A protein has these predicted regions:
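Peripheral (often C-terminal) accessory segments that flank ATP-dependent C-N-forming ligase machineries
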Residues: 247, 266, 281, 319-324
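Hydrophobic beta-strand scaffold residues
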Residues: 40, 109-110, 138, 157, ...
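Active-site nucleotide/adenylate-binding loops and adjacent lid/helix of ATP-dependent enzymes
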Residues: 2-12, 16, 24-27, 79-80, ...
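ATP-binding N-terminal substructure of ATP-dependent carboxylate-amine bond-forming enzymes
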Residues: 2-116, 121-122, 126, 145-148
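Phosphate-binding site of ATP-dependent enzymes
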Residues: 174-258, 281, 285-287
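Glycine-rich phosphate/pyrophosphate-binding beta-alpha loops
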Residues: 91, 167, 224-227, 292-306
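Conserved metal-phosphate-binding beta-hairpin within the catalytic cores
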Residues: 209, 264-299, 307
Length: 324
């Protein structure tokens, strides 16, 4: 006999640059959620931060928010009707801790990291400063502001907005002219920028963590085939052949898994995270790159692939997250 089904509110969209990725991720969730265990409703957030009830059919169209949909005036009262919220939102609104803060204030249960962890992890600079205290190895970097002297910078470098995901606003500069151009581009995404040494001869490696109650399931290592470039937006969400499960040196594999578990705990993450690394092939050194507290759940995203590779079916990944 089946028990009472848990009622789940799935949120997606948002007004961030990663809105489209969220729409792709939510399709993966609804295609894999176990409907023998969960009832669910969809609520989409448009680019103006308006909230709407949405159906599975509506979200097939990426312009779902242009339709005549039922607008939700009070999302708090609406969310209180559900047992748990699954906020499948990338970028600001969720990964910067805003939604979590609101849910915590009203005692609404949700999937994923809390507001404290999300705020720190979303800001690349805060993450770097935090993890430096724990001797986590990182690529040399400088914090850019209007007073930064860029005349002494050694090229190539990689320019990153501090608060933006999906590799948006990130570019590799090979000279001063390109650096100035890419700083301008990065400033469109965030007012704070970091400039890192770009390791040309590298491997981009990733590790996924899924929390199963108090147990942490740490994946094997994924690798991004970057062909000497870097893991940009298209590599993450368009070019399906750019991700593989990597066979790597046993010691390096264990080093990555141990760092990942430690970082997850240091940053007080909850539920899930994907942790990214750069491996310098010349110096044989591993560097932490970034942590993602709500990784993509598209058909080609690394997080579900890596966890699935541990033997956990896609639907069971979602079930574990919803049953925490």
């Amino acid at each position: 006999m089946g028990g009472i089904l848990k009622n789940v509110l799935i949120l997606f969209g948002g007004n961030s640059f990663e809105h489209v990725i969220s729409c792709k991720s939510v399709n993966f969730i609804i295609n894999n959620i176990d409907t023998n265990k969960f009832n669910y409703k969809l609520v989409g957030i448009d680019y103006d931060n308006e909230w709407y009830e949405v159906t599975n059919i509506d979200i097939i169209d990426e312009n779902w928010f242009t339709k005549d949909l039922n607008k939700i005036v009070n999302i708090i009262e609406y969310a209180k009707k559900f047992d748990i919220v699954f906020p499948m939102i990338h970028g600001n609104t969720l990964e910067d801790g805003k939604l979590q803060s609101m849910f915590e204030l009203y005692n609404i249960k949700y999937v994923g990291c809390d507001s404290y962890s999300s705020i720190i992890c979303y800001d690349k600079l805060l993450t770097k400063l935090f993890l430096e205290k724990y001797s986590i190895p990182q690529v040399p970097y400088v914090i850019y502001n209007k007073n930064t002297n860029i005349n002494n910078i050694e090229y190539p470098v990689i320019v990153k907005p501090c608060k933006c995901g999906s590799s948006l606003g990130i570019n590799v500069a090979k000279n001063k002219k390109e650096l100035k151009k890419y700083i301008k581009k990065a400033l469109k995404y965030d007012s704070n920028i970091i400039i890192e040494k770009f390791i040309k001869n590298n491997r981009e490696l990733e590790c996924a963590i899924l929390q199963d109650n108090k147990k942490l399931i740490v994946s094997d290592i994924g690798e991004i085939i970057n062909n000497g470039s870097w893991y940009d937006f298209d590599a993450k969400y368009v070019n399906q052949n750019n991700t593989i499960i990597s066979n790597i040196d046993k010691n390096l594999k264990e080093e990555i898994k141990n760092y990942s578990k430690n970082i997850f705990n240091i940053m007080k993450c909850k539920g899930l995270s994907r942790i990214d690394y750069i491996y310098d092939l010349d110096d044989k050194k591993l560097y932490f790159n970034e942590i993602n507290t709500m990784p993509g759940f598209t058909e080609i995203s690394m997080f579900p692939k890596l966890i699935n590779n541990t033997g956990i079916e896609f639907k069971d990944i979602i079930t574990k997250l919803l049953n925490m």
